[in-house]
């Protein structure tokens, strides 16, 4: 039964629907965190420097680029970045620089 349910999600329509739901969940989570901070005054080491993902093979990078484009359609500010831009964003990746094909970056994530 589980296998059939899994296979039913392996199509473009289900992928788009699931991405939309993940984006909605992420937006809700981000808003809820802001509410908790505002209402409680809780302090933590909050850093909003964004989240970078890097890829070491072209196929994975192309899939991530397609997903980033889809997410942009739902309002997520995730963008595709070159290896050079990724290394400017996160210099600690320099040791892997030659292996990196490219990446994605979401500035508003923490």
Model-derived features: where do they sit?
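Rossmann-like flavin
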Residues: 2-110
């Amino acid at each position: 039964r589980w296998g059939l349910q899994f296979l039913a999600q392996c199509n473009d329509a289900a992928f788009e629907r699931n991405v939309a739901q993940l984006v909605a969940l992420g937006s809700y989570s981000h808003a809820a965190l802001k509410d908790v901070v505002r209402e409680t005054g809780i302090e933590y080491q909050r850093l909003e420097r964004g989240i970078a993902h890097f890829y070491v093979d072209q196929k994975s990078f192309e899939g991530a680029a397609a997903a980033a484009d889809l997410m942009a359609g739902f309002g997520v500010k995730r963008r595709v970045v070159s290896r050079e831009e990724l290394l400017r964003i996160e210099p600690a990746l320099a040791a892997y620089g030659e292996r990196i094909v490219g990446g994605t970056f979401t500035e508003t994530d923490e």
